[in-house]
């Protein structure tokens, strides 16, 4: 049964009438451009064919009812006329409440809604299950009530909800790609202007995501430390963000910086340049150059930004040994575990899967999870 069929059937059972529409918003994987988003830089993600799906209908009162199919059909209910506060027990409900609360601040011309939510974006893998939920909820209200909001505004609203209501610091990339993704394309995003450029993906190339299943423990504290180090670097150059510093300016005075901060800054500056070049390489179908840029990105995350772990490095090496210069592979996401992403000619996918199955667990004691994805369309009706 598809997610659409599942949520529609649950909706009718739970609420006693049929849903009027079903909305989806995808998860994402970032092909290159890591930790550049909060430095006002560039990222190159694509939406993937794993999504959050919501069957919904407007109500003629001010009540919101939400059922979470993936959490034992837990039900949350709140009013649009009372202050929206955090749910005491259901963490999932806070993403919904946060989006609705922040949408009220932007455009309060919507009424109540019934929703049933289900999704298949793997959680805790760094594939943005939370952003896809935020964008899906925003899109539901936008579509049901014809709100004059575009994808970028729905994305910004989701980011605000996550930062201010849920209390998790995140950049804008995850929500933007979920809202604006384009089938068979990646999206080059300028995280300062929020300008986007669709970049066509070469034909016959699979987007493979492999979860190391190494449990991330440091990710919150270390993420904040990296952010502070980048801000320290920007202050040193008297710029609002590292986006405004050139590699030449950095090289001239790198020796004056704290050595750790210097390494962090160098990663951001070189990663921004790589990301812009990667968009051109992809568009020209130059998988060899894309592979080189992904390899440089991984080395920079490992040596300068220091956010990889041995298990991730092992996975990258196993994949690289199979694909050579026919594709690319690197860690993706915040770091300290999580996933790697690879662009692989479709005919090499079975060989990569076999090599990983034979070697990764033997070397690390952990079993990986393997996903073959397609670059997919952003949020909308399904």
UniProtKB/Swiss-Prot annotation:
Gene symbol of the encoding locus: galK
Protein's recorded name: Galactokinase
Compartments reported by the entry: Cytoplasm
InterPro entries: Galactokinase, Galactokinase_bac, Galactokinase_CS, GalKase_N, GHMP_kinase_C_dom, GHMP_kinase_C_sf, GHMP_kinase_N_dom, GHMP_knse_ATP-bd_CS
Protein residues bound to Mg(2+): 130, 162
Pathway assigned in UniProt: Carbohydrate metabolism; galactose metabolism
Protein family (similarity comment): Belongs to the GHMP kinase family. GalK subfamily.
Keyword RNA-binding included in the entry's annotation: no
Record's function text: Catalyzes the transfer of the gamma-phosphate of ATP to D-galactose to form alpha-D-galactose-1-phosphate (Gal-1-P).
PANTHER family with a match to the protein in the record: GALACTOKINASE-RELATED (PTHR10457:SF7), MEVALONATE KINASE/GALACTOKINASE (PTHR10457)
Active site: 174 (proton acceptor)
Natural source organism: Escherichia coli O127:H6 (strain E2348/69 / EPEC)
């Amino acid at each position: 049964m598809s997610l659409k069929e599942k949520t529609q059937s649950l909706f009718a059972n739970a609420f006693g009438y049929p849903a009027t529409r079903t909305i989806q918003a995808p998860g994402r994987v970032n092909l290159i451009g890591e930790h550049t988003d909060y430095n006002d830089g560039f990222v190159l993600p694509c939406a993937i064919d794993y999504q959050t799906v919501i069957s919904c209908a407007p109500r003629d009162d001010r009540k919101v009812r939400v059922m979470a199919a993936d959490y034992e059909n837990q039900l949350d209910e709140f009013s649009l006329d009372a202050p929206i506060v955090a749910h005491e027990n259901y963490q999932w409900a806070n993403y919904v409440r946060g989006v609705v609360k922040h949408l009220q601040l932007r455009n309060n011309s919507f009424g109540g809604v019934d929703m049933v939510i289900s999704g298949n974006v793997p959680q805790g893998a760094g594939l943005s299950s939370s952003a896809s939920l935020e964008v899906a909820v925003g899109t539901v209200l936008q579509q049901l009530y014809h709100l004059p909001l575009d994808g970028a505004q729905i994305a910004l609203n989701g980011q605000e909800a996550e930062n201010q209501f849920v209390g998790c610091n995140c950049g804008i990339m995850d929500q933007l790609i979920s809202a604006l993704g384009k089938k068979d394309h990646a999206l080059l995003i300028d995280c300062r202007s929020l300008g986007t450029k669709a970049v066509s993906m070469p034909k016959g190339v699979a987007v493979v995501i492999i979860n190391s299943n190494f449990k991330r423990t440091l990710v919150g504290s270390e993420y904040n430390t990296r952010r502070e180090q980048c801000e320290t670097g920007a202050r040193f150059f008297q710029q609002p963000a590292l986006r405004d510093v050139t590699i030449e300016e950095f090289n001239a005075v790198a020796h004056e910086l704290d050595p750790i901060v210097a390494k962090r800054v160098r990663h951001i500056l070189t990663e921004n340049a790589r990301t812009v070049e990667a968009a051109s390489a992809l568009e020209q179908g130059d998988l060899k150059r894309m592979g080189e840029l992904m390899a440089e990105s991984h080395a920079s995350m490992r040596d300068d930004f220091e956010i990889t772990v041995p298990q991730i490095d092992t996975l990258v090496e196993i994949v690289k040994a199979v694909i050579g210069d026919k594709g690319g592979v690197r860690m993706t996401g915040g770091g300290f575990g999580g996933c790697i992403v690879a662009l692989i000619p479709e005919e090499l996918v079975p060989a990569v899967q076999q090599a990983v199955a034979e070697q990764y667990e033997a070397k690390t004691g952990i079993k990986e999870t393997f996903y073959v994805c397609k670059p997919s369309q952003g949020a909308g009706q399904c």
